[in-house]
């Protein structure tokens, strides 16, 4: 499945009207622990240049993540994986759930409402939406302040 053209090396992708670099849209800050889960081929180029000290992991094991970007195309799979994704998230972090846009032509049974409802069932609420690229939409899920688990090392 295509993830769009991507951005030239050293520049962040800007999709949509905002002109905001993707790294900024996703809230990736210097020193962040970034999880890229099931990222499509070429996503590193689409993401663009990262802030200093960002540590990328592609598996959920290890210390909690500040930002996770997880790509899914099927509701059943997302529903099965969401509790583990939420558990891997730092309590103050953000979990970006990405699914193919309807206009991309990719086969999917996910929509923003499906992702939002699955997030709510897992104890997370949405607080941002983002056009990741020409193929993928994203919804940021976070723990409510009152529901945040204790911080882990």
Residue ranges of each PLM-predicted region?
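Conserved beta-strand signature within the Rossmann-like core of class I S-adenosyl-L-methionine
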Residues: 91-100
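Short acidic low-complexity segments
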Residues: 54-65
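N-terminal, charge-rich interaction modules
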Residues: 5-45
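Short histidine/acidic/glycine/proline-rich micro-motifs that form metal-
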Residues: 101-106
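Class I S-adenosyl-L-methionine
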Residues: 123-153
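A short glycine-rich, Lys/Arg-flanked "PGG" loop and its adjoining helix->strand segment in the class I
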Residues: 79-91
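Conserved Class I S-adenosyl-L-methionine
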Residues: 109-130
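Short, glycine-rich nucleotide/cofactor-binding loops
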Residues: 68-78
